[in-house]
Amino acid sequence: MNPENRGQETTGPVYAPVPLRTAWSVDLGNGLNGTFVHSNIDGTATFLLPEVRSAAAPTHPTAPAAAQTQYEERAIHLIKVLNACADALDKGEKELVNKGLQMICSLASDDGEPLHRLASLFADAMALRMVQPWQGVCRALGLQKTTPAPETAAARRQFAVMCPFLRIAGTAANYAIIKATQTKNNAVLHVVDLGGANPDQWLLLLRLFATTRPRAGAHDQILRLTIVNEEDEFLSGTAALLASEAARLHVGFQFHPVKLNINQLLSIEPLGVRTGEALVIVSTLQLHRLLADEFAEVAANPHDRKGKKQVHATMTRADALLRDLAGLSPKLMVVTEQEADHNGAEFTGRYRKALKYYGALLDALQESVPARGSAVERAGVERCLLLEEIRDIVACEGAQRRERHEPMLKWAARMDAAGFVPAVMSPDIVAQTGILAHILAGGSTAYRVSREEDGCLFIYRNDDPMFSVSTWRTV
């Protein structure tokens, strides 16, 4: 309702004294409270915080400094409300969560500033978590429907363009692959992609392979690529793209599709590894999805003297797969994962870490418009990719939660337990990757890479480590 209309009476006969606006206060705890104002004319409701007007209410032009101050105040309040909602959700205080979500929806929008969009994404996920127990309601409203795979794949490709984290990671992986295998006499370089890599990464690898392998250009030098992916269109399109480039480069090329999701890869047999190949295994944002499934491994002597079954250890499917892959004795394994800790059992801590991580991603997406994509494409990435991940982290528990991101410190322990040792990236690989990051950032320091003491490469946005790239070999 327009502010100039406040206090005006309605025209026409009035049969009962109906107030134009109804107001009631709401206490969200933690010292946070405000007032809901409901209009009986147009049915709208907004939430007013002390000395901060609702985002839905019109504002008068102010000086830039005042506008920035108002935005910062509203941002602080949004974060406080989000945190209060998460605390209430963790305690099962549903009415408090409901009021908090009403407040967030009145203050934030999915097409505003990054913080507003972040609040909208997390409000969606918290609302889904609250109604998850009512499966009938979720199904009737279509809340459990996931984004179709082609749309998710398109959003992932657009994310790689707008936020070059994965392009940087793929380049570092390719340099490491070539360096680890170019001195080998094997006629076949077999690269197994467990999923997640962009076809552009393999185009670059083909070109590097053609220029750096012994007797480059001869057809007896073969690059064999195995890709695990469940989409026919992706597999066929990638095969045609790479076969055409290999023919242009006069490089022998073989393509081996494995039509499976990483969750369905129950053994290493479908990978089709052959003896005599220079084997390289690449996993891009895939292994964390296997941490949800745990099982007890039975000892070699499954029964003790009393006939009771002995449990040797409990491991995840990720650990079991890593152990099987180590048994193949690859020349190199490259692992790219989110440098985040979203696998905690405690909900509130997991939520707070996710809020910080995805806040940085949304800021990065915002900065990429319009240089590397449009606002429409940015919105598609947030809706089809980031929202799905946030929903998984915030709304799901148990085996249903697949986005179990872990920091490199934990992945290093898993790799060590599986039988891998670090294959430290050389300084020239780090330098070349750093140059690419500088170019993709338009000459700024928004994206940079850093090699830690253990040889792992971290990709930063400003001061935040966002993704890690680590290289491994077997003893």
What is each stretch, according to the model?
Residues 1-475:
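Long, compositionally biased intrinsically disordered terminal regions
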